[in-house]
Regions:
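N-terminal secretory signal peptides
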Residues: 1-51
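A residue-level marker of the well-folded mature domains of exported/periplasmic proteins
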Residues: 67-391
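Bacterial lipoprotein signal-peptidase II cleavage site
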Residues: 51-64
């Protein structure tokens, strides 16, 4: 089904920071912020790899889990991130999800987000909001799961109205060192659906039968996204091949430019999808230089189609389900370590608008295939797994 063998840039993978009481439990994959802090250590070995990632608020809700039973008239929400709200990717996507949630939740007030939060400062940043009795503290990524265990445990006793929402985190594997998950929930998007949506667009838009993907780091979510991306594209045309790199980091646009330029030259890539924030901006520069009429980009995780992005034909959009978390805080049902799933059924995963470079015929086919992706019938788990095992 793959049509080609794959090789990838080999990079180091660092384990999550675990608490002292359970360091021996397991080692898990490096998180997004650690990749940013460590920089692009493998950048000099620019290896190319060929082959072929809201509800409405209640008008009469309880005062969350404080147990008072009285109606709360206002709520505060705060966001902590490793990057900035204008990164064009990960943190901007979270920030826009929060703004959308606020539009339908008039009782809520957003405090100033904490940007560029270093690993050493993550717990302190959260504690600052705990001390203000902020109702919902959002951590943009699984790195915060490894940093907040002690803060959460203390807050559960001393600030029972404070709740924590950590995105891109599986509580069953990434929060085993927590003393309590009572005030915690996480969000997990359907990465298979995201990748498949990008894959059908790539499969329908490519003329050279060669598509590319850049990931910031080799996370399980990144591997699932790429595997579904290639599987869906090959469902359109089994001869399509994929080029990938999972070690690009999230900050160096020039690396994205260089990778994409080489893939265009050596592998004739004409469609790209990325999961690497600023690096994706560099990839788009290379596509534009090669010709925006023939080289296309699928953006992620926000909708950026417009005149200032001539290569972007559509976007895979992730909503981080913050509105649902707000509803649960208001009703008193938030917590217990539940994982909120974002998918095509609840608006957590979607495609953005199309550029005028996408024909009506292609748009109609994308719509048809999207319904199959939503129903789980377009690609199988086995097809995705077969590709993922080869990476």
């Amino acid at each position: 089904m793959r049509g080609a063998t794959c090789t990838s840039l080999n990079g180091r993978r660092k384990g999550h920071i675990m608490s002292e009481i359970k360091k021996s439990l397991s080692a898990v994959m490096l998180d997004r912020r650690q990749a940013i802090v460590l920089g692009l250590g493998g950048m000099g070995a620019l290896a190319l790899a060929g082959c072929g990632g809201s509800g409405s608020s209640s008008s009469s809700s309880d005062s969350s889990s404080s147990g008072s039973g009285s109606e709360q008239s206002s709520y505060k929400v705060a966001m902590i991130m490793s990057g900035i709200i204008t990164d064009g990717g990960w943190d901007q996507g979270h920030y826009e999800s929060l703004k959308r949630a606020l539009e339908s939740h008039p009782k809520w007030e957003m405090l100033e987000p904490k940007e560029n939060t270093a690993d050493a400062d993550a717990a302190t940043a959260a504690q600052t909001y705990v001390d203000q009795d902020v109702d919902l503290i959002i951590g943009n990524g699984n790195q915060f799961a490894s940093d907040w265990a002690e803060v959460v445990a203390d807050a559960a006793d001393s600030h029972p109205k404070v709740h924590f929402l950590i995105t891109n985190t599986d509580p069953t594997t990434e929060m085993t060192d927590y003393e309590t998950l009572d005030p915690v929930e996480t969000v997990l998007p359907d990465f298979k659906q995201t990748g498949a949506l990008a894959g059908v667009v790539a499969g329908l838009m490519t003329k050279t039968k060669s598509i590319g993907f850049i990931g910031g780091m080799k996370l399980p979510s990144t591997l699932t996204k790429y595997s579904a991306y290639l599987a869906a594209a090959q469902k359109i045309d089994p001869s399509i091949q994929g080029q990938y790199n999972f070690e690009a980091g999230f900050t160096d646009a020039s690396l994205g430019t260089n990778l994409t330029q080489q893939w265009i030259t050596l592998n004739n890539v004409d469609v790209m999808w990325g999961d690497a924030s600023a690096v994706d901006n560099g990839a788009r520069q290379a596509l534009e230089a090669a010709g925006a009429d023939t080289h296309f980009d699928i953006a992620q995780p926000i909708d950026i189609v417009g005149d200032d992005q001539p290569t972007v034909v559509t976007s895979t959009v992730t909503d981080w389900m913050i509105g649902q978390a707000m509803d649960e805080v208001e009703s008193g049902s938030f917590g217990g370590g539940k994982a909120i799933t974002g998918n095509m059924d609840n608006g957590g995963i979607s495609l953005g608008k199309f550029s005028d470079r996408v024909s009506k015929d292609v748009q109609d086919k994308v719509k048809e295939y999207s319904e199959q992706i939503k129903a789980g019938t377009f690609i199988t788990d086995d097809e995705v797994s077969t590709i993922q095992k080869s990476l």
